[in-house]
Amino acid sequence: MGKTVVCPGSFDPLTIGHLDIITRSSKLFDKVIVVVMRNYSKNVGSFTTEERVDFIKRCTKDLPNVYVDTHAGLLAEYVKEKGAHAVVKGLRAVSDFDDEFRQALTNQQLNPDMETIFMVSNSEHMFLSS
């Protein structure tokens, strides 16, 4: 059985930094699911969910083990539903770690089998934010 990971985010818009994390994940894991998370409590962004999915699919078309999906519920439930082993999150700076750490702890309580893997952003992409 291969290792499946989830790369979650709003991806509004998808940045070169996001694409770098997705590409690097695709080299480390058998299957990478990029999931565009829909957060109805946030204001509508620059692009619709469908536009973001289409853009990610076009940008990852040469990565055969990358799949794109959407989800409007809890990430921990999605990971369990997909049979994934972990979530991969990119960190640009130490300031990102605090929020991501708290989210990881919450997800771990909701799904004890779920791991969170932090990947440090490539230095040339550290200042990009969606």
Residue ranges of predicted features:
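Nucleotidyltransferase catalytic core that binds NTPs
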Residues: M1-S130
